[in-house]
């Protein structure tokens, strides 16, 4: 998954099973303009890390320093840079209507600013043209956690307000070069998780954390303030890009620009007032952290009160910039959690302590042998509730499910659990639509197996299996690919046939 299993409380969650989601549906039950697709991201899919002018990203550095779980890297990954034509053909054969992928800033503008790499430009033009030839909508993420290392070295990347101008200039290149064929743009992937994992717990690049808050060895960073600084700069960056697009491109190109959020639905562990408040506080610290400023112009009151002077403030000019700077909301949603009250500790706190909740995925902790840390259970109802909550809390925006899928340590082609998962969550989306939520698309994570940011090559999420031991990186369809294809092609009740 993107950064997704990192949600809020990395590696400490257990897993639950809650049923839900419409059953007996077909493709025709969804609105005519609704799109179904699948997703990847640049560092996780492309490979070709040192080819054709690409410069390192913070993920290259993080992985090569051995900080990932399996010590693997995305140097080759699924080798999408060389295999995209075959993959797009496979997408068309599967019946995909859209494909969400990210652009590598370091491949397009290797120094982070300045000269455009013509080989990078050629590659992305080729991908977009290949999709158009096959009748597949491109949905582009401008940055999927892979900041150019050059900017990290120069001014600490997201910790500096200088990132706003550099990112906006990069986005300008993308809109100018690709916007005649791309109508759906997402600025940032999971800023709520990028700030937490990259600058508090340290499990995501660039791996900043400070003791005792990190979940890894902490050598650089300050967990008490850096998550808030980086999220603040991400919000300002997103808003600046939206303003650029609206003023310079939207009237001509007719596209839309949104932001992506990691979504985890929080149930109260009990019906106590304290747990009900904890579940709401979790939502405010997760969804509200990013969306409240972009809709209402400021952070949620509970964050301002709890974090106090450690939370940056917006100037009046910045408030005017950020308020209303969303055309759509993209969410990455994988599972739900039970949340209960945890007293707010005195003294030094990080984001997790500021939130003052405990979270788990089972109401009672199961024996450890009954779950795998790379897997999680099905709760389609949680996705439905999340969508309905976001609509009620932040407005009737269009929504796209930009990632949803099931990772597993099982590398088999026969993956009925993934079929059940995807089928259930698509049903949850349909339930939300029937309840009035303007959901316009659903993307499975991932189209093919990729390098997972938390699990490396230990977890597989692809509809299509990639043999990472074979230099040719061959693809083979899993049962889930066959089910999804049958569904997209209108079969009323796709038969689950094990792949040959």
UniProtKB/Swiss-Prot annotation:
Gene Ontology biological process terms from the UniProt entry: carbohydrate metabolic process
Disulfide bonding pattern of the chain: 209-218
InterPro entries noted in UniProt: Glyco_hydro_1, Glycoside_hydrolase_SF
Protein encoded by which gene: BGLU2
Domain of life of the organism encoding this protein: Eukaryota
Name under which the protein is recorded: Beta-glucosidase 2
Signal peptide: 1-24
Listed GO MF terms: beta-D-fucosidase activity; beta-galactosidase activity; beta-glucosidase activity
Binding site for a beta-D-glucoside: 44, 144, 334, 403, 445
Recorded family membership: Belongs to the glycosyl hydrolase 1 family.
Keywords: Disulfide bond, Glycoprotein, Glycosidase, Hydrolase, Signal
EC number: 3.2.1.21
Glycosylation sites: 222, 410
Active site annotation, chain numbering: 190 (proton donor), 403 (nucleophile)
Reactions it catalyzes: Hydrolysis of terminal, non-reducing beta-D-glucosyl residues with release of beta-D-glucose
Lineage: Eukaryota, Viridiplantae, Streptophyta, Embryophyta, Tracheophyta
Organism: Oryza sativa subsp. japonica (Rice)
């Amino acid at each position: 998954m993107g950064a997704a299993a990192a949600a809020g409380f990395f590696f400490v969650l257990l897993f639950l099973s809650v049923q839900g989601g419409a059953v007996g549906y077909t493709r025709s039950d969804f609105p005519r303009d609704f799109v179904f697709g699948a997703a990847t991201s640049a560092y996780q899919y492309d490979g070709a890390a040192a080819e054709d002018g690409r410069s390192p990203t913070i993920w290259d550095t993080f992985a090569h320093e051995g900080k990932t779980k399996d010590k693997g890297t995305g140097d080759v990954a699924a080798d999408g840079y060389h295999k995209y034509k075959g993959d797009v053909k496979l997408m068309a054969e599967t019946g995909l209507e859209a494909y969400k992928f990210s652009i590598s800033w370091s491949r397009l503008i290797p120094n982070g600013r300045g000269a455009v790499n013509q080989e990078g430009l050629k590659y992305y033009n080729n991908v977009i043209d290949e999709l158009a030839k096959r009748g597949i909508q491109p949905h582009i993420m401008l940055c999927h956690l892979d900041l150019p290392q050059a900017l990290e070295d120069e001014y600490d990347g997201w910790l500096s307000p200088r990132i706003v101008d550099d990112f906006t200039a990069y986005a300008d290149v993308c809109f100018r070069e690709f916007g005649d064929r791309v109508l759906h743009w997402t600025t940032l992937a999971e800023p709520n998780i990028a700030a937490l994992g990259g600058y508090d717990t340290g499990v995501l690049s660039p791996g900043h954390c400070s003791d005792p808050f990190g979940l890894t060895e902490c050598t650089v960073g300050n967990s008490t303030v850096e998550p808030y600084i980086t999220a603040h700069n991400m919000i300002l960056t997103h808003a600046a890009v939206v303003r650029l697009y609206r003023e310079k491109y939207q009237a001509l190109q007719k596209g839309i620009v949104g932001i992506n959020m990691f979504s985890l639905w929080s149930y109260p562990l009990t019906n106590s007032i304290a747990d009900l408040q904890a579940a709401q506080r979790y939502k405010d610290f997760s969804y509200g952290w990013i969306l409240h400023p972009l809709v209402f112009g400021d952070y949620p009151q509970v964050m301002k009160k709890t974090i106090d002077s450690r939370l940056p403030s917006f100037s009046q000019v910045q408030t005017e910039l950020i308020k209303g700077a969303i055309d759509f909301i993209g969410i990455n949603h994988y599972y739900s959690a039970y949340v209960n009250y945890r007293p707010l500790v005195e003294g030094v706190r990080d984001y997790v302590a500021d939130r003052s909740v405990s979270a788990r995925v089972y109401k009672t902790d199961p024996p450890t042998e009954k779950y795998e840390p790379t897997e999680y259970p099905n709760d389609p109802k949680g996705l439905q509730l999340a969508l309905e909550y976001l609509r009620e809390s932040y407005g009737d925006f269009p929504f796209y499910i930009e990632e949803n899928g099931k990772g597993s340590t099982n590398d088999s082609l026969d993956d009925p659990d993934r079929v059940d998962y995807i089928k259930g969550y698509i049903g949850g989306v349909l339930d939300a639509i029937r309840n009035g939520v303007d959901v316009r698309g659903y993307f499975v994570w991932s189209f093919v197996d990729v390098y997972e940011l938390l699990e490396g090559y230990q977890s597989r999420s692809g509809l299509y299996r990639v043999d990472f031991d074979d230099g040719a990186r061959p693809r083979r369809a899993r049962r889930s690919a066959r089910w999804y294809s049958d569904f997209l092609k209108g079969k009323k009740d796709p038969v689950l046939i094990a792949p040959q």
